[in-house]
UniProtKB/Swiss-Prot annotation:
Keywords: ATP-binding, cAMP biosynthesis, Cell membrane, Glycoprotein, Lyase, Magnesium, Membrane, Metal-binding, Nucleotide-binding, Receptor, Transmembrane, Transmembrane helix. GO terms for molecular function: adenylate cyclase activity; ATP binding; metal ion binding. Its cofactor is Mg(2+). It comes from Trypanosoma equiperdum. It is an enzyme of class 4 (lyase). This is Receptor-type adenylate cyclase. SMART domains: CYCc. Residues 81-469 are cytoplasmic. Binds 1 Mg(2+) ion per subunit. CDD domains: Nucleotidyl_cyc_III. It is found in: Cell membrane. Mg(2+) binds at residues 108, 151.
Amino acid sequence: VDTAEKLSKNGCASNYGATQISVWSMARALNASIPPLTNPMTPSMTFRNSNAGRISGVALVGVIIGGALALFLVVALGVVPYFFLHNTRDNNLAPKELTDPVTLIFTDIESSTALWAAHPELMPDAVATHHRLIRSLIGRYGCYEVKTVGDSFMIASKSPFAAVQLAQELQLCFLHHDWGTNAIDESYQQLEQQRAEEDAKYTPPTARLDLKVYSRLWNGLRVRVGIHTGLCDIRRDEVTKGYDYYGRTSNMAARTESVGNGGQVLMTTAAYMSLSAEEREQIDVTALGDVPLRGVAKPVEMYQLNAVPGRTFAGLRLEHELLNDDEDQTTTSCSDHSSSRTDLSVAAQTIAASLQSLLGTFTPAQRQKALIPFCERWRVPLPQKVGNVWDNDGCQEAIRRVAAKVGRVMDFGTRKASSSVTSLERGGSLFSAGGATVATVASSSNFSCVDGRCGTVQLIDLENDSTTS
């Protein structure tokens, strides 16, 4: 009992360990007077795991899978929302106070209809790049994208200087971007040469420049920009969940943009004087004097922002503004959004009827699937849909919008073709870019496009074929 109590005190009663260990002989086991072979001792027991500090294969696989899942969650919860929000309007940046002046920016691509007619395979990607570059600048300068219509942007800013910086950087950004082709620049130069041949008083600002000089000043799409500052009627659109700006300020900004040339930035005196003296010292402007604008009672004092030093421009497009010429309309004032059947040209109505007949046997879901690529490639806004599938009205609206855009391009080609045929009848020649002598003649259906790129056309080799149909 004494031994058991002693062992209990030493923590060995449950046989969890041993203390006072000694080695006895068999004789000692039979005779207690014989001493043990070794003196009693309590060893220090340290247990070691041979796999300590190592990871098993199964555990390693688990760590890899867990790490991959964690990385996926970071991407899903962080990066994806970033890109989603990056491509949407941030209403926090929208000017909302009715008593605070708003600076509005309107942009438009010069000769976009002609470019679509000449390069239908290039323009979808070029316009997508145009949108991406401008949206990156909107975010950089804390401005607000009000809307895009076709090739045009309407942008609002609480800060006049931020708006001016955006417009200046836009021109530099487009100049230094790699567009991957010279076709757009060649088309702009050809358009200038054609106008010079038709108008003896017109001097092409870029078509006759030395190649090295041209490359320092011009590259890719040419975007004209108009800026105006003033009070607006501000409304929140319950459909788009965004803010829109109405009234005289909006009209003035749009008119300012419409008289400019591609690559030119115009601002009204109201926008220029909204800048502080220090801000005005940071920009280079040229006073253009009073400029008459359609729908404005008195001429408006205008300034040109010299975003790219050395650029020269043709005279302001006052005749286009006053006559409301529709060859190269400012798409913010003539939208693809509302294209009723009666508003469509003959060519556009034929396109719409063809699409309706072609897709009439499809279900709404199939029609939507077929129409979306056309809308995306022609940069036509999609109709508002109810649920996941467009209804019949939505499909009809998409068809009308596509037909309106393509119809304008085809009408442009028809006018150019008619002009070319007229010049040929007078003894002139029309040469294609590759050097072959050709003429584009509209067929009886009035469908044609520049260089036979779309529609129903006839190409005639003037040297080898003297007959026409």
